[in-house]
Structure formats: C-alpha cells, structure tokens
C-alpha cells in the first residue's frame, strides 16, 4: 500500500477539488497513459488494485509508471461515537485527482495490450477514464 513515510501534519482538512489538473496532464515516461476525466479521491487500495490488474495482464512485458501518490490522510471517527471530542484518527490515504491528470503510464507493450490492461485498471477506479497515446508515438 502506498503512503508517505512521514508527514509534517498527521491530519489535514478535506479541501475542494475545483478546476482541472494543471500539472501531470501529458504522457511523459511511457507511450500510453490512463487519464482521469472526473475529480475524485483515489485511495491507496484502489491504486494498488489497478496496478495489480495491469501487471497480471501485461505479465512480465513492459513497464508501468504510477503518476499519482496518496499523500492526503483521511480521518474517521469510530462507529457509534457521539459528536464532538475532537477529530478522528487517520484511517486511510488518498491521492487528490482532478480531471485531465495522467494516473498511470505504460511502455514496452503493443497498443492492444496496453488498451486492455488500462481497461482492467479503470474498472478498479471510481471515476471515468480515457486511454491516451503519446503524440510522438510510432507503432
């Protein structure tokens, strides 16, 4: 599971997901990418499930890059707890993903294999996604 080794603050405010992604919108490492079309919190478990689905389909061929990292702690109070008495303890970690963000990249496999691998990965994510190809890709 992905999570930071250490953080400056144990708990963060929830924040808002306004607008589109400003950075990380282009395929830079691989030839193919999976782009987010909606804003969402993607948990470390969802990222891991998508990674495993892609790796299983691609077997040993190719390389995968994960372009998002869950660096935001989400706190939760225990069940059946009265209101008040402070903020709950951090339960899990999320990556804040805005529309246009490239979440995963792949290289070293044919286009058809990449399309299917990303389709399987997209099923593990709670948002609409889009398969994109690097502009200078020849294949």
UniProtKB/Swiss-Prot annotation:
Could you name the domain of life of the organism this protein comes from? Answer: Bacteria
Q: Where is this region: Disordered?
A: 1-21
Q: Name one GO molecular function term.
A: tRNA binding
Give the matching InterPro entries. Answer: Ribosomal_uL16, Ribosomal_uL16_bact-type, Ribosomal_uL16_CS, Ribosomal_uL16_dom, Ribosomal_uL16_sf
Q: Where is the composition biased (Basic residues)?
A: 7-17
Q: Which Pfam families does this chain map to?
A: Ribosomal_L16
- Which CDD domains does its entry note? Ribosomal_L16_L10e (cd01433)
Q: Which UniProt keywords apply?
A: Ribonucleoprotein, Ribosomal protein, RNA-binding, rRNA-binding, tRNA-binding
Q: Which PROSITE patterns match?
A: RIBOSOMAL_L16_1 (PS00586), RIBOSOMAL_L16_2 (PS00701)
Can you list the GO cellular component terms from the UniProt entry?
cytosolic large ribosomal subunit
Q: What's any GO biological process attached to this entry?
A: translation
What's this protein's family per the entry? Belongs to the universal ribosomal protein uL16 family.
Give the quaternary structure. Part of the 50S ribosomal subunit.
Could you tell me what this protein does? Binds 23S rRNA and is also seen to make contacts with the A and possibly P site tRNAs.
Q: Which PANTHER family match?
A: 50S/60S RIBOSOMAL PROTEIN L16, LARGE RIBOSOMAL SUBUNIT PROTEIN UL16M
Name under which the protein is recorded: Large ribosomal subunit protein uL16
Give the species.
Answer: Chlorobaculum tepidum (strain ATCC 49652 / DSM 12025 / NBRC 103806 / TLS)
């Amino acid at each position: 599971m992905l999570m930071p080794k250490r953080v400056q603050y144990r708990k963060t405010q929830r924040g808002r997901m306004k607008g589109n992604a400003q950075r990380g919108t282009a395929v830079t490492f691989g030839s193919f990418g999976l782009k987010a079309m909606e804003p969402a919190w993607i948990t470390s478990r969802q990222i891991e499930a998508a990674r495993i689905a892609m790796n299983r389909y691609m077997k040993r061929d190719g390389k995968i890059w994960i372009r998002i990292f869950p660096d935001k702690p989400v706190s939760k109070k225990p069940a059946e707890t009265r209101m008040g008495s402070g903020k709950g303890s951090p339960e899990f970690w999320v990556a804040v993903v805005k529309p246009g963000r490239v979440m995963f990249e792949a290289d070293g496999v044919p286009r058809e294999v990449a399309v299917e691998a990303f389709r399987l990965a997209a099923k593990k994510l709670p948002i609409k996604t889009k398969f994109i190809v690097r502009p200078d890709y020849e294949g």
